């Protein structure tokens, strides 16, 4: 009877390993009380249809009360491991109580046959005794052999009740034979059985399954299982981004997350038959401090994940920007001087993710050392090394470089740097014993070793030798050596860049940049980066380039301009590393100005000669120009996926080529006329379908700057567009050209010029769903305007190329210019992508007005939060101030917009009056304000 089961329910729960240590469990759920209540419901309503709503109401009440108790305890004490085990205990009680009721009253069988007896088994995370607040529960209904009608009825009844309670239930109905057969064929099912946990029933089937599983599935298949789980892990990392340092990490499946710890435990359980990570200490697989680190990392990750579930009210594993601050606050990370609480929290998260990686690496290395996983090495090289007992003071042990003794680094601190150098030079991995010896001896990396010329020589060779520095420096960073040897670098380890533009932490970004630099030099990126791949082989100061990439962001997070502060770091550090005075000066200059080339290319008008001349006066030499180009490309490429595109490549190439021309004596005042003549001559060849009269008429339309703004092919397309419009006397002509190579669409508009045209066109393009990344504005001698916009798709970047969208774009322009549509009205309907996520970032509005950047224009730079219609609002403000916009540079960096306008006043002159400048600043700051805020 159900009442008999109820009498021992709470006592049996106390024996469960996963829930034995939960204090005052009955405050979460008393199974005895619940069972008595269900017995009462059966007495009141019978077992028919009337019972169902009352049963669901009582079970839902038990769930809600229990969840509230678990949440209250969690928010008071903040232990994620306690939370997931208490949630598991609650789910266990509900499932067991429902099973008791179903088999006792709904489908009773006084004397069930052997085929009607079954066990219920928890699998997945639920099987481990871990259940996050909104996670699924996975159940296995374990049968002796084939299904019977009664078993099917019980399973169906239970599942429908659980689903009606709002629980997400994954389930399987299998016999013991099914489980064994499918476990052999499918590693996912094998893993589910491996971490299964008895939940309800007579237990005989569960014990039979575990005995057969160990004997028939696990025995002799260790290497196969290890390979499968590690391949599964590697594929998961590739899918989510193969880095632990993405700024919106996945707490469960991301690199360094809970799944990596679980993978480690699955392998340990499979190979060593352990039930707890602490058991691996006795097996001499992990050291006590490593097992302690496992427990700390797991509790931190579970705590963050439980907070994430409670904050979002759903099963959610990605820690997006909009929840990071709240989770950090709940976990006790407050603002300190110069550092936000969220930055401290995320730094701790990244350090935990790094610890998880260290544990996984040590564990897997130990497996390989015991030949439980086939090694993957260069066999010929290892055979040669194996014949040498001593390799630069180390030994080859199990195809890895090992220390002679655990005290080697304490006796010879220099060997800690030499170990990585030797591993790099011989393309060999490092033995886990050596990694452990490093961990125990990190204190030897102090002032004395940092001042050792030989240590610095070895480090500089690691960084600037012909072997890939990223691999070795990553090993040094993961081991904690890099931060100790270069303390300034230690300050940026796990340092997040709290915005939506940067994807990685500062140290991870830096290591990626070094890897990209090496690939450029090795010719591995020639197709993608032809100019950099050519230029790098002309570089003389090769060592300075590699050191500059290592140091370019080393002063981030200190407050102040990280370029200036970083240059000071370089001036002190480079001599220590062994660089000459000339190399030190070059490195410091590159760090100081590492943003100058991208700033000029992306935010200044490259057709303005003064832009190029000012840049050249800063750079001064062809060698610095080459160094700065390669550094800039590696830096941008390493920011994150999608941050580099062909449009940026085009602008950098144009700036490089024009700067090189100036340095070789080009771009002189006298030469400008010759360049215009050359451009017009090239256009003449392009326009073979124009007769002489047509060609001369077209030449008369353009002012000098126009002929230098485009190549001959583009000028030819525009000439045909202009001629067609003038012949047909159309009020407006719109032409689009998709350039997939540069991932942009070029929109050319030829229309009657009037005040405010650019602003209205910007509004029309934004309303059509286009992001404007560049604009060139020309007034022709006949009073017509030829405006060329470079756009991308606002929905996902890339070229704006959908047929429907292009058609909408043309219609939108026509309607706006004809007055049929107001851009402002349409734009208010559009929301910025990721609006809720960007809201957490504060982007101070800023307006900078520069009358020195151009000889003919006032240059206005505007910074603020990006949103749909921002460019329209800004240009409308400038138009209302009777300013003429000659050109614009539009850039977005995550949530931040940086727009630059070249303007003149109504008389065609620079704006110099202080009152007018103040008015411009005030109006633009007003336009930067988000109307939806």
Curated annotation (Swiss-Prot):
Superkingdom, natural source: Bacteria
Entry remark concerning the domains of this protein: Has four distinct domains: an N-terminal nucleotidyltransferase (NT) domain responsible for UTase activity, a central HD domain that encodes UR activity, and two C-terminal ACT domains that seem to have a role in glutamine sensing.
Cofactor(s) needed for function: Mg(2+)
Regulation: Uridylyltransferase (UTase) activity is inhibited by glutamine, while glutamine activates uridylyl-removing (UR) activity. Uridylylation process is dependent on ATP and 2-oxoglutarate, which are effector molecules that likely bind to PII proteins and control their activity.
Record's protein name: Bifunctional uridylyltransferase/uridylyl-removing enzyme
PANTHER family, sorted: BIFUNCTIONAL URIDYLYLTRANSFERASE/URIDYLYL-REMOVING ENZYME (PTHR47320), BIFUNCTIONAL URIDYLYLTRANSFERASE_URIDYLYL-REMOVING ENZYME (PTHR47320:SF1)
Presence of keyword Nucleotidyltransferase: yes
GO MF, one example: [protein-PII] uridylyltransferase activity
Gene Ontology BP annotations: nitrogen fixation; regulation of nitrogen utilization
E.C. numbers: 2.7.7.59, 3.1.4.-
Segments of this protein annotated with the region Uridylyltransferase: 1-390
Keyword NAD appears in the UniProt entry: no
Matches recorded under Pfam families: ACT_ACR9_3rd, GlnD_UR_UTase, HD, NTP_transf_2
Reactions the enzyme catalyzes: [protein-PII]-L-tyrosine + UTP = [protein-PII]-uridylyl-L-tyrosine + diphosphate; [protein-PII]-uridylyl-L-tyrosine + H2O = [protein-PII]-L-tyrosine + UMP + H(+)
Limits of the ACT domain: 746-829, 859-933
SMART domains referenced in this protein's UniProt entry, alphabetically: HDc
Ranges in a coiled coil: none
HAMAP family from the UniProt entry: PII_uridylyl_transf
Family: Belongs to the GlnD family.
The protein's role, per its UniProt record: Modifies, by uridylylation and deuridylylation, the PII regulatory proteins GlnB and GlnZ, in response to the nitrogen status of the cell that GlnD senses through the glutamine level. Under low glutamine levels, catalyzes the conversion of the PII proteins and UTP to PII-UMP and PPi, while under higher glutamine levels, GlnD hydrolyzes PII-UMP to PII and UMP (deuridylylation). Thus, controls uridylylation state and activity of the PII proteins, and plays an important role in the regulation of nitrogen fixation and metabolism.
Spans annotated as Uridylyl-removing: 391-745
Domain HD: 506-628
